[in-house]
Amino acid sequence: MKGLIIVGSAKVGSHTTALSQYLKGHFEEHDFDVEIFDLAEQPIHQLDVSGASNLSESYKNNLQTLKTKAREADFFVLGSPNYHGSYSGILKNALDHLTMDDFKMKPVGLIGNSGGIVSSEPLSHLRLIVRSLLGIAVPTQIATHDTDFKKLDDGTYYLANEEFQLRARLFVDQIISFVKNSPYEHLK
């Protein structure tokens, strides 16, 4: 089974990326092939349905990679920092490039991180988007705070909060259960 984690932070090495890497490790323990598409490291161009924009080749290539991975995915995890009480614009842009066919009846996990006030509002907003894309947002979600992470000597963040480590396992188990036991397989 294949999964795609889309990280919607504009910061390379973000807390959202660290949480995504933690989750990836747990999926891999269950022999799932999971890739992280980090929009800070692989930026894509703004959606332009007119075709008037002069697009860079690297942005075009990144977008094609995202679209291919989305088509191949059996499930998604969407991750975003809390930007002014909602999810990031770059994640919205990435989702605008994808279609209902990419998400139709596939489980979607939602994760977010806040630097200020802890809030699950970005995840509530994403839940509506997932429904509009015909995906199935799983009930368990993860909303962390910067203080739930520690830094390694090289500056890389890692999830240190044991409560969220436990929640991450529940989150992964729930997505795996949805993937393996989907009553909607015939609707894809």
Swiss-Prot record:
Instruction: Extract the InterPro entries matched here.
Output: Flavoprotein-like_sf (IPR029039), FMN_Rdtase-like_dom (IPR005025), NAD(P)H-dep_reductase (IPR050712)
* Cofactor(s) it depends on: FMN
Q: What class of enzyme is it?
A: oxidoreductase
Question: What superkingdom does the record give?
Answer: Bacteria
Could you list this entry's UniProt keywords, alphabetically sorted. Answer: Flavoprotein, FMN, NADP, Oxidoreductase
Q: What is its EC number?
A: 1.7.-.-
Kindly list the GO molecular function terms attached to this UniProt entry. FMN binding; oxidoreductase activity
Would you tell me the Gene Ontology cellular component terms?
A: cytosol
Q: Does Oxidoreductase show up as a keyword for this record?
A: yes
Q: How does it assemble?
A: Homotetramer.
The entry's function note states: Catalyzes the reductive cleavage of azo bond in aromatic azo compounds to the corresponding amines. Requires NADPH, but not NADH, as an electron donor for its activity.
Against PANTHER family, the record matches this protein to: CHROMATE REDUCTASE, NAD(P)H-DEPENDENT FMN REDUCTASE LOT6
The family classification in the record reads: Belongs to the azoreductase type 2 family.
State what protein this is by name: FMN-dependent NADPH-azoreductase
The gene name on file is: azo1
